[in-house]
Each structure stands twice: as structure tokens, then as C-alpha cells.
Regions:
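Ligand-binding clefts of soluble mixed alpha/beta catalytic domains
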Residues: 1-460
Length: 460
């Protein structure tokens, strides 16, 4: 397609030319139909390089923009920024979600400082709308420079396998989708741009229209799986059949976060012990971000706890992971949405307080009868409290384990935790689903007033 457009006929033809950018919008909207906005807006002798539109996704209104890499490599011009800003403005006025489809090599350098102002305005819009209407970013091609910051300002970022997401190119990392998944910048990696748009739709349908709307309700099927011991198995056995969408699977691999439905209503699911008994800094950051996103849209958070605590080796301490641990605690404590916890295995010390403790996290906390809840790991507690009994033992390891088992049964069982008021009830595996559904229903009217302040000063 020629970059130069001189007549109205050429303008109309150019605006309707089939492109990947236009096709991606047909993937997004119901029946591939949408109403285009500012179709003839131009930057000099060419179109603005972005298609902006509104339509319906699963029957609900959505605004979207899709960058067109065939026009000046999708470079952001002042004209393109104005089109995108209009989408954000309309979304703010109407309380409607925004989907941004990114495919651009960055700003148009010929615009000079105008491009900087344009990006600044768009970043202001995404910031102002954060937590007000859902924002989903789809990285379908190259997303470079300030555009990468714009995409990462969304609630969730989905990326195609062959796409790139970077602020500055790095030959060593290669700016790949795989890297974006591993460092947590992309929540989902898909085979191609069409699959990425479909994944964005799947996430979007689980979110409310805005922060004042209720979570969507759907007809649902009961789960077909028995409750297992792994994070994914528990989520799929408790939530509605085929409703679980895991997010950030490659980042913070000891933890599990997912959107799902429970009794037809959206819930956020957090689980530990996906691959490791202890949570890393990445796990803490991942869970904190997810909990804050759910809280922004009043999505109930269900946390399945089975962890020995936080990883605290020399490398972790040197990294300053305590900041991420504090961030996790802060995210749960600050959240006013419904918070439910089920201790399915081990829950020791700070991890119990952060994830399942009634003082800061859970409105209601339950435990399986096999749960072990303790301020210290039983082995550590025995070393500290019963050290004299270990003296002279022929087999020190066996003696320590015997005392630890006894300590767990007598001092750290679910029954002891219930007597001490640490959990609200002891349930069996086959009771988890119904208990959670009943709890969400009875807590639907939850209201909490916070102390007046500009914002909390969470560790970032």
C-alpha cells in the first residue's frame, strides 16, 4: 500500500484495505463486526497507522485499537496518539474495557518532541484508567520503546510466540516472547496473533465491565476432576469445569495464579507449592500483582496454601527479597474484596500470616484435617524447644523426625489451629467447593471503609 494518499477515493480505499491490524479486530469482536472511529484520520500523506473501533465481545461493549505495521512500520505519530487517546477518553466516559493490539517499532522520529508528548498523554490515560476499566494488551508483532511501557500498563499482557516486547533491543536476551513470559511481563504466550486475541477475549470475559460493575455470571458445569495435591489439580477440581485460565505460568514457578469461575461467578485463584515448597521473590511479586488486580475489580480471591514459607538463602537475602515478601503481605492486607483461604498442606510462620492469616488476609480461613499450621516448621521447632531430648540420640535424624511428627500432631494440627481461632473450620477435600461457594454467597455484601489517605505506600 502506498504511503501517499491524495484523493478522497484513495483515502476510502486505503482505510478499508485488508491488513493484519484490521483482521485482528475481526478476531476480537463478535461476528467480526465493529464500528471504526476516525477512519480517515491522517498523518501527513498517509493514514494514522492505527485502527480504532468499538464493538461487542460476548455481548458486552469493548473499545479497541490495533496498530497497523504496514503504515510507517506502525510508528506512533501525533495523529495516531490522538486516535488512541480518544478510545481511552470514551472508555473513561462509558466505563467500558479497552483492548490494545500492539505492532509498532516505536515513535515516529520525524515527529520529534511531539512523539514524546504523545506517549506521555497515553501513559497518563492508562494510569488514570488503571483499576477503573479492564485493560488488555495484545502484543501481536514488535512492541518497542515507549509502546512497551504502554502495553505493560495494562492489567494483563498477552503475547504471540513470534512477537517481541522490549524498551531497548538486547542481543543477548533476544527480546522474545519466551523471555517476556519468564520475567513476568507477559501473562500468556500464544501460538500466533489470532490465538493471542482469543486469549485476550477469554480473560476479558471473566472481568467485569468496570470497577463498579458486578463480576459476570455464567452457566456452569461441575468439575470432573477429583481434588489432587498439586496447584493446578486443586484449582480445576474446585472451580467450574473448563473455566480455569492460568496466568503468568512461567514466572514465579512455585506459585499458581488463575482466573476461573466458581458457581458461575468469576474468582481469582492463588495456590502455592506448584513446583517448590518455598516462595521466591518472583512468586511474591506475581501473587501480589494478581491480588491487587482482582481487588481493583472486586473479584473474590481464593487462596490454597501449602508452603513452608519464603525462601531465605544468602542469594535471596542479598537480592532484597524481603521487599517482595512485604509487598505480598501488603497486597492481601490492603485488598477489600472477598478473601478466602484453604490450608491444604503446610502453612508455616510468615507465609501463613500473609496468605491465610485472619489478621491481615482471609475473611474466612479453612483447613483440611491433614493441614499443619505452625509458627515454625516442626523440625525447626523441635531443634529449638526440645534440643535436650536430641542429645545422645544414636540416629539423630530419626529422633528429630519422630519428635517433629509428634510436635505436628500435638501443637500444629488443624484441630489446634481451629481451637486457637486461626482457622474458621476444618473441612474434607470433597467439601472445599461447596464451602467456598457458600462463603462467597454469604459475603457478597462485604463492605470495608479504610482510613482516608492519598494512597498506600506499598513496596514496589
Amino acid at each position: 500500500m502506498s504511503d501517499s494518499i491524495s484523493t478522497l477515493a484513495e483515502l476510502k480505499a486505503a482505510s478499508q484495505t485488508p491488513t493484519a491490524a484490521r483482521n485482528r479486530l475481526t478476531y476480537l469482536f463478535d461476528e467480526g463486526k465493529f464500528t471504526e472511529l476516525d477512519a480517515y484520520a491522517a498523518a501527513g500523506d498517509s493514514l494514522a497507522g492505527v485502527i480504532t473501533a468499538f464493538g461487542y465481545v460476548e455481548g458486552n461493549p469493548v473499545y479497541a485499537f490495533s496498530q497497523d505495521v504496514t503504515v510507517r512500520d506502525g510508528a506512533l505519530t501525533e495523529a495516531q496518539a490522538k486516535k488512541i487517546a480518544k478510545v481511552y477518553d470514551l472508555a473513561a466516559k462509558t466505563g467500558v474495557p479497552v483492548v490494545g493490539i500492539f505492532d509498532s517499532y516505536g515513535a515516529d522520529v520525524s515527529d520529534g518532541s511531539k512523539a514524546l508528548n504523545a506517549y506521555g498523554e497515553l501513559l497518563m490515560w492508562t494510569s488514570n484508567l488503571s483499576g477503573v476499566v479492564p485493560q488488555i494488551a495484545v502484543v501481536a508483532g514488535t512492541c518497542a520503546g515507549c509502546a512497551a511501557m504502554l502495553a505493560e500498563s495494562a492489567d494483563f499482557t498477552v503475547i504471540a510466540k513470534d512477537a517481541e516486547l522490549y524498551v531497548a533491543p538486547n542481543a543477548n536476551i533476544k527480546n522474545s516472547a519466551e523471555n517476556a513470559a519468564e520475567n513476568g511481563t507477559a501473562a500468556v504466550v500464544c501460538e500466533d496473533d489470532k490465538a493471542a486475541v482469543e486469549a485476550a477475549k477469554n480473560i476479558l470475559t471473566k472481568l467485569p465491565q468496570n470497577n463498579l460493575s458486578p463480576v459476570p455470571m455464567y452457566e456452569f458445569a461441575d468439575p470432573t476432576e477429583a481434588v489432587g495435591d498439586d496447584a493446578d489439580g486443586i484449582a480445576k477440581a474446585v472451580c467450574d469445569g473448563d473455566s480455569v485460565t492460568e496466568l503468568n505460568a512461567e514466572y514465579g514457578k512455585a506459585s499458581y495464579t488463575a482466573l476461573a469461575t466458581l458457581g458461575g461467578a468469576t474468582v481469582g485463584v492463588v495456590a502455592t507449592n506448584k513446583t517448590d515448597d518455598k516462595l521466591t521473590a518472583a512468586d511474591c511479586s506475581k501473587i501480589a500483582r494478581f491480588v491487587r488486580t482482582c481487588d481493583a475489580y472486586a473479584i473474590p480471591v481464593v487462596t490454597f496454601v501449602d508452603t513452608e514459607g519464603f525462601k531465605a538463602d544468602d542469594d535471596t537475602e542479598a537480592y532484597g527479597a524481603v521487599k517482595d515478601m512485604a509487598k505480598l503481605c501488603h497486597a492481601y492486607a490492603e485488598a477489600t474484596t472477598i478473601k478466602l483461604a484453604v490450608v491444604t498442606g503446610k502453612a508455616y510462620g510468615p507465609a501463613f500470616i500473609a496468605l491465610a492469616g485472619k489478621g491481615s488476609n482471609a475473611d474466612l480461613s479453612f483447613a483440611l484435617d491433614t493441614a499443619v499450621i505452625s509458627a515454625l516448621a516442626p523440625v525447626t521447632a523441635v531443634e529449638f524447644l526440645q534440643h535436650d531430648e536430641l542429645k545422645g540420640a544414636t540416629d539423630l535424624t530419626a529422633a528429630r523426625n519422630t519428635l517433629a511428627d509428634k510436635f505436628a500432631k500435638e501443637n500444629a494440627s488443624a484441630a489446634v489451629a481451629a481451637k486457637n481461632g486461626c482457622v474458621d473450620g476444618i473441612i474434607a477435600k470433597n467439601e472445599i467447593r461447596q464451602t467456598l461457594m457458600d462463603s462467597i454467597e454469604v459475603m457478597a455484601g462485604k463492605r470495608i471503609s479504610r482510613l482516608p489517605k492519598k494512597h498506600s505506600n506499598i513496596q514496589l
